């Protein structure tokens, strides 16, 4: 039976008044005596206390919490020989350094086909404990009383689960920033590692960090030129990716942002899932910093180790640009000086965003804010939906919006850009509409009676004569729905709006007075007053950007889009 199910099973048996007997065949291990050489923060002490109360369980906390140092304290307190399981050589090197620093012990290693284990505290790469190209587990030299699984969300993979279940250690703990899996297989993690014993919210983590958190949306004009033989619907996602990574205008935008970051004394990390993309950007950034380093995870273990050592040896006084694949830098990439992240390749999942953001979340002398440049390809529907999911992640992570063109807004208290949830946006959005003097442009994929009535009441009855009001919506798919849509369009037009129907429209966007942009996944004005949001609606988010430059650029692109296509 998976160890993580023991408590739940016992509770079930007790509630049924069923008798039971436990045969405990766990390994207690060999006693060790290592002193902990550091002092934990209050949050780390709370985490350690919970772990000591339980033989198994998970510490869930983001990068910068200090999961490694907390685990080192746990090793000292448990006083039993320990094996630490990691996924990569980069993580192995980090753990070697941490064990030496916090426990004053040089740990053994099992990696690259070489077993240099001590039987006291050892670190092993998961793949080194199984036969080549097989899930068959190799014979082990030592038995351990405690196993610590770093990045334990990987336990849901069969090979790692199979390995984790092969240990009979009395104590088994998992460490992760993202216990919830995109594929929904987190139960496997809990079966092998136990329940979550301690977790920190993003807001709690932010309090532990000595810097502010900002994301900067950069709206890209990337799109396909009209092609009578191909439509957006029958293009493959890979064809989009192939065109995106070689789009010169987009790459120039990214390169300029990176160069400006370096000029401002920042240290950027550029992440893409395509090596070809990184190589193109590397050429664009040649001589833009004292050190421009491309890390992809390719090469032998020795080559990768040498590359990391070179990166770690760069003095903090020297300018640095790092380009890396998301897979390589997503875990175990420890460069505390990094303060700027360029997300230059589209992705959707919030867990991936949390991992990538974590690369910036280590305290470092002189780091007072971290910035994430997110390149929003809003003209490609599939990429736009990916961005909408990332936006939800930024809000959960406690990030604030920042735009380059803040000068015009800086002196106005009510002009700050912000991320809103569905429950939060209504008051400020309706106030922006009610105060419109010059123009309102609204993109609504679907019209409802509530939206139509709200828009007429808030805007069309109050906006000054001569103001421009445009509403764009998606053409109804059926004749019945078209009839309903036409009736609502007629109401809007009779009230003074110009309405245009489009064959394709996915964006939910509002541009007010050519200076305020609302953009996200919220279906504006769709809910009646005193409406209780559904669980799905509660997930939706939108951003308010107070920037004439950004608002006018997006409006020009979106209004003119139909004419191009």
Could you tell me what each predicted segment is?
Residues 54-75:
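Walker A/P-loop
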Residues 61, 179, 348-372:
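Conserved SF2 helicase motif VI
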Residues 68-101, 273-278:
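Conserved Walker A/P-loop ATP-binding site and its immediately adjacent core
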Residues 93, 108-110, 114-117, 279-280, ...:
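Conserved helicase ATPase core of P-loop NTP-dependent helicases/translocases
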Residues 145-146, 153-216, 394:
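Post-DEXD/H (motif II) to motif III coupling segment of the RecA-like Helicase ATP-binding lobe
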Residues 232-273, 279-284:
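Conserved interdomain hinge at the start of the Helicase C-terminal
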Residues 387-392, 396-413, 516-565:
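Signature of lipid phosphatidyltransferase scaffolds
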Residues 432-494:
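Primarily the HKD phosphodiesterase
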